[in-house]
């Protein structure tokens, strides 16, 4: 019942989505509720991680401070920085964003359903909510 109320408030129509299971809807809503809280608190961006995410080599370079993020992305723009992969083949294109810590930031040009780790900006949160 709480889940249905939250879906009705934050993501109308999600409960009727035919291709998502109840568990998938609940998982998505855990993200949406966090985005709403971040928006309410005026946070410029938030890092989101699933409880079973495995951190890779040099993850601390991306998580210990945010200077690299602020140097590469305008906090007032809509962006999502994916910090994980499911080893799913995707199409990408160059973004023009400078590499950091041996990692590139290409634009995602195809679908990728993983949400185990990402950074989402305030404007992107507003877009999805």
Task: Show the residue positions of the predicted features.
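An acidic/histidine-cluster motif and surrounding catalytic segment
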Residues: 1-49, 53-129
